[in-house]
A protein has these predicted regions:
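Local beta-strand/beta-hairpin segments that build beta-sheet-rich folds
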Residues: 59-60, 211
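Unchanged
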Residues: 31-54, 64-118, 183-206, 214-277
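A conserved beta-turn-beta hairpin within the catalytic core of GNAT-like acetyltransferases
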Residues: 18-22, 170-174
């Protein structure tokens, strides 16, 4: 979301090459394999609008399932940033999926055809599309994987921290990790986080807010069967509270990526072998 000093919003219009020609959207697009999502939004702004931008905050993380004109169904996870212009000159994209970029007053934007996620982000009233029937998850490559994962820095009223240990045979095996994992097809990140929390630790939690957005790229990762995979995961981390903690136990089926779960005091956590994500989240949370 990029706003001018007078409140106008920067929007782009879908071209004939897009799934929805003539429909307006916030600038942005897909994350390339191995790319940090923050770098992706800066790149997409430059491509679609000619403007250089700097990120000032993370607005939200959302997901939607949309029926495309060709009859297929697409699940998209979206990270919405707040950005400010730092340079460049406004111009349309050339031979891309957008054909116009404009600063639009909010009152005018409310009357434009907007993609649903854009209308929601701007707080504009619109008719919610009908729910899309969701079939089986489309197949994806196993040698080059890009996933979207939701994780939690989980605490209880006593200040303990909940961690899950990565099973041997998985990347990071033996390290203590944040509860969480990949989002399922048609699942929101929040729902995925709470589902994974129960599967990996037997806890029921409440999401209090977003802590961070990041990624991990490991082109030489090995899967559980020892098969090489060009692995890229985009990760969102939430603050999660378990008001009524129970004994931590793994409930997901044998063969999953977690082999143990436990509550720890902050002093105990300091002596554990932690995953990179767990270390980063604990440092960010203070």
């Amino acid at each position: 979301v990029c706003r001018a000093a007078d409140g106008r919003i920067l929007l782009t219009r879908g071209s004939h090459r897009s799934a929805f020609p003539g429909v307006w959207s916030l600038p942005g697009g897909g994350v390339d394999h191995g790319e940090h999502p923050a770098d992706a939004v800066v790149r997409e702004f430059a491509e679609e609008t000619g403007l250089a931008v700097a990120i000032t905050g993370i607005r939200s993380v959302v997901a939607d399932v949309v029926a495309l004109p060709d009859g297929s169904v697409e699940h998209t996870d979206r990270i919405l940033y707040d950005v400010t212009v730092t340079g460049g000159d406004l111009r349309p994209e050339t031979d891309g999926t957008t054909d116009l970029a404009e600063w639009v007053p909010p009152a005018v934007a409310a009357g434009l055809p907007l993609l649903p996620f854009t209308a929601r982000a701007l707080g504009t009233q619109f008719v919610e599309p009908d729910a899309v029937p969701v079939g089986d998850e489309p197949p994806y490559r196993t040698d080059r994987v890009q996933r979207f994962g939701a994780y939690g820095l989980v605490t209880d009223p006593a200040g303990r921290i909940l961690l899950a240990r990565i099973a041997e045979g998985y990347p990071g095996g033996g390290l203590w990790h944040l509860p969480g994992g990949g989002t399922d097809y048609a699942e929101t990140p929040e729902a995925a986080m709470l589902r994974e929390l129960y599967e990996e630790t037997s806890q029921r939690g409440r999401i209090e807010g977003l802590l961070s957005v990041g990624h991990r790229y490991d082109p030489a990762a090995l899967g559980p069967e020892g098969v090489p995979m060009d692995w890229h995961v985009i990760r969102v981390v939430y603050r999660v509270v378990v008001e009524e903690p129970v004994t931590a136990a793994v409930t997901e089926a044998a063969g999953g990526s977690t082999d143990r779960a436990s509550w720890f005091t902050p002093d105990e956590v300091a002596g554990l072998p932690l995953s990179e994500l767990a270390r980063e989240a604990l440092a960010q949370a203070g």
